[in-house]
Amino acid sequence: MPIIHVLIAKNTGAVLCEYTDYQGNFLTIARMILKNIKQNTRHTVQYESYQCHYINQDNLTYLCITSNFPEDTTFAFLMEVQKQFLAQNNYDDIMKEQSYFFQNFKNNLKNILDYYNKCPEKTLNGEIIKNLVDAKSIAIENVEKLIDRDQKLNITVQKSDKLYDQSKNINSLANSIKNQKKA
């Protein structure tokens, strides 16, 4: 089964935008869940035969209702909803507006929902691969920086050893000249 219902709400319970293609009491279920959400959490709640997944961050909740849908894909879906919603809307404006003010975002919700419903595993695998490639490139970059630092440190140590040897030679030369003058 697919992602059935998606909504974006403020912590006050005001639903800013929602979308579903299905008939049912999904908004009622969502409102019951919204009442019990703690700030800055990510969780899945079972309600009868449905799973309600949500991300609450910065006083906004991104919630969807699914039936037998991969949890990882669901959270990838919610993060995409969050990313696009915040990219299109100013946070301060979001906090000022009333319920259903952002229904113009409904088409975006539909497009994201359709995309994730059509190929959930492929979408998740693509996200995982992208994240792994990004992590790999960052790790390679960090290793290259470490190697570069190590090389610079080795050069500095070699120069330091050379200067130390030179200072010992100069010191013993100075001592021998001093001893010759005394004699």
What do the PLM-derived regions correspond to, one by one?
Residues 5-7:
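Generic short beta-strand
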Residues 2-3, 12-183:
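Acidic, low-complexity cytosolic segments
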